[in-house]
Regions:
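Short secondary-structure junctions and interdomain/linker hinges
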Residues: 44, 165-169, 178-185, 298-316, ...
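Generic amphipathic alpha-helical segments used as scaffolds and interaction surfaces in large
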Residues: 149, 161-165, 173-174, 279-289, ...
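Long amphipathic alpha-helices with heptad-repeat character
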Residues: 130, 134, 144, 360, ...
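Extended, charged amphipathic alpha-helical segments
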Residues: 260-393
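Extended, regular secondary-structure scaffolds
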Residues: 172-280
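Extended, helix-rich architectural segments
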Residues: 1-200, 515
């Protein structure tokens, strides 16, 4: 951006001229363009301070000043500062109940000419060998099968693309960061691999990794623009600030030069969508900060009290006659001589600090329950023993309540992911085989501790036997079968072979050949 453009932009702003977001970027006025967006990094920095134990309020506890009888300062004594990583524990438990196991992707695309295929299969079965109609039917079936295989192959390519990009690991990372910073983003970008083939990669953006996130949503909560701020170091060892700004039609790479001016490089967004999934939520330990502060203060005070009584202290009820010859700290003492009727004993605690311990236990319960977090102590887990999946569900009801609340948003995030990845496959990764955006892809959240698969299969068999479920659906619910489509083809072949054997036996029986 030239000096002339800088002056022009300043004059326009001074006279109240409203430039659009894209006009500001095109004119090189990146600062004003970024100011039109919501800066997520400020709030993220505040949340990180609450998350990290070393920056908790208790860590600012002032030392105790020790004074003499006249009020003069003798020394200062450091007090205990016990910070408890409740946010870490609460966030990790919430993460496990959302993405402890990867989400399941399912292909619900209607298979083309399915009814026609079924009619041809039935007609094919009743025709005798040698009938010229068989060749025509086989050709039609092969054509229909090719169309259906293209859909299946596209869906498999979709799943392979996510697997190669390590989506399951990245979505966990993005959820973990969002639970800490209240906002994170998965940035999908494409590059060429060592063989020159296009490939998709995912980068999780977070303030803890020095990324600044800026968003612009419309009134319907649709993402209109996204900006990523970051720093690099040039060849002269100077820090260079960057903004990558994404819209559905364009991508701008902005680099700040010396003097504050910007170099702006615009490129077409070939994907056709903003290649970002933004995760937004409240911190997982929301509204428990005051309880956490109180627990940390109580435990620190208890530790101070324990320190005061940890070293033995003598109490004499009369004058010690041989006090001039008392042993030094490093020496052993054997005898104290006191006046008649006197006594010497160690100072002992009488309160046992029960009230404070009770308070800490109650606060701990409140923190976990109000953040919808189960108390997964070793004792509690031992008590569960060989619990079934249903029993674990009841025990983890608080975590499931929170997970169900998160799924209201994450259901949309996963739907956006499938739409975005299909657009990337159509427009960048696999252009010759376009058609991925026509796929109907659904998803399911997996149970964190796995499902009671044997019970599910038993119920599915009962429903199938009663006529309420197709064989194909039964195969899809079986944990013993990896590919329901392949297994269905095998069953069809077995049925055809069985039918042929029956026809052959009937012919042999008609001629009196069968034994």
């Amino acid at each position: 951006m030239s000096v002339f453009n800088v002056i022009k932009n300043e004059l326009k702003a001074a006279f109240g001229y409203q430039q659009t977001f894209e006009e500001l970027i095109a004119n090189g006025d990146i600062r004003r363009a970024i100011n039109m967006m919501e800066d997520r990094s400020v709030r993220a920095a505040e949340c990180i301070r609450d998350y990290k134990a070393e920056s908790h309020k208790i860590m600012k506890r002032e030392p105790k000043i020790v004074r003499d009888k006249e009020g003069n300062i003798i020394r200062s004594k450091e007090l205990n500062k016990i910070a408890i990583p409740y946010p870490l524990y609460i966030n990790e438990i919430a993460l496990v109940f959302m993405y402890g196991r990867p989400p399941k992707w399912m292909n619900e695309t209607p298979m083309p000419r399915r009814d026609e295929r079924a009619q041809l299969d039935m007609e094919r079965k009743v025709l005798e060998e040698g009938n010229p109609r068989i060749a025509e039917i086989d050709k039609q079936i092969a054509s229909i099968q090719a169309e259906q295989d293209r859909i299946t192959d596209r869906f498999q390519k979709y799943k392979d693309t996510l697997k190669d990009a390590r989506f399951s690991a990245h979505v966990r990372e993005a959820k973990r960061v969002a639970g800490i910073e209240e906002c994170s983003a998965m940035l999908f970008h494409c590059r060429k691999d060592s063989r020159g083939n296009p490939t998709m990669e995912i980068k999780v953006l977070s303030k803890m990794e020095n990324d600044d996130i800026y968003t612009m949503f419309d009134q319907y909560d649709h993402l209109v623009a996204f900006a990523w701020g970051y720093n690099t170091v040039d060849a002269a060892n100077k820090t260079v600030h960057h903004y990558d700004i994404y819209m559905a039609n364009k991508i701008w790479k902005c680099e700040q030069r010396r003097g504050g001016q910007w170099n702006v490089f615009a490129e077409e967004n070939r994907i056709g969508k903003i290649p970002v999934i933004v995760f937004i939520q409240k911190v997982e330990w929301e509204q428990t900060e005051s309880l956490i502060n109180r627990v940390e203060k109580a435990m620190s005070s208890t530790a101070d009290s324990n320190d005061r009584f940890s070293d033995p202290r003598l109490v004499a009820t009369a004058e010690i006659l041989n006090k001039d010859r008392l042993p030094k700290e490093e020496e052993e003492g054997e005898m104290f001589i006191v006046n008649k009727g006197g006594d010497v004993h160690y100072l002992e605690r009488t309160d046992n600090n029960e009230a404070r311990s009770t308070e800490i236990d109650k606060l701990d319960d409140q923190i976990l329950s109000k953040s919808f977090t189960p108390n997964l102590t070793l004792e509690a887990l031992k008590g569960l023993g060989q619990a079934s999946g249903a029993m674990l569900q009841r025990y983890m009801v608080l975590a499931n309540i929170k997970a169900d609340k998160h799924k209201e948003k994450h259901d949309e995030y996963l739907s956006r992911t499938s739409s975005l990845v299909c657009a990337i496959l159509d427009n960048v990764l696999d252009i010759p085989n376009r058609g991925y955006s026509d796929l109907v892809i659904s998803h399911e959240f997996s149970e964190p501790f796995g499902e009671d698969v044997s019970q599910i299969l038993t119920d599915a068999i009962k429903q199938h036997n009663s006529g309420g479920m197709s064989t194909e659906t039964l195969l899809e619910h079986s944990y013993l079968i990896k590919d329901a489509r392949v297994e269905m083809e095998r069953l069809d072949r077995e049925e055809e072979e069985k039918l042929k054997r029956q026809q052959m036996m009937m012919q042999m029986d008609a001629f009196g050949i069968a034994k």
